[in-house]
Amino acid sequence: MRKTLLIAMVILATAFTANAQDKKEESKVKQLTYKEFIKKIWNIESNPRAFSYRGSLPAVIDFYADWCGPCRRVAPIMEELAQKYEGRVLFYKVNVDQERGLASTFQVQSIPMVLFIPMEGQPSKQVGAMSKEDYIRFIEDRLLK
């Protein structure tokens, strides 16, 4: 009986772990490291003074930390927006604890901080959590006009 119970618990734990991994892979908001940022967004090393966007679509970058309550509230909103604007806007996230250099580059002093990058011109940033409707307004006004 104990052996059967143990086997059932192992199977359940494996199923939950596999399900959690599947959910992570489904994310439309892509995590950016410093190397990926240089490749996809802006090569800070070759052109540190003038922002030059390298992307093919406008972008939204969420600067966050795992321990930040407001950041955890913004994350599902970003996922919804990434689905809503799929094919029109790229969505990324940067963990400020792991990518301190990127946080410093954009003078992130308070999180969440969301960077809106248009195809042409300079990025704009919004500090603090906002409603989904406010993020939609920012995207429509600053990225898709």
Describe every region a protein language model picked out.
Residues M1-I38, K145:
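N-terminal targeting signals for export/organelle localization
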Residues L32-L57:
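A short beta-strand-turn-helix
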Residues S56-A59, F63-W67, S110:
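Short pre-active-site segment immediately N-terminal to redox-active cysteine/selenocysteine motifs
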Residues S56-A59, G87-L90, M119:
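Loop/turn elements at helix/coil->beta-strand transitions in domains of secreted/extracellular proteins
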Residues P58, R100, F106-L115:
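Structural micro-motif
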Residues F63, V74-A82, E86-G101, V108:
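Thiol-based oxidoreductase modules, predominantly thioredoxin-like and allied folds used
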Residues D66-R73, M113:
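C-type cytochrome heme c attachment motif
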Residues S110, L115-K145:
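Non-catalytic, surface beta->alpha helical segment in thiol-disulfide oxidoreductase systems
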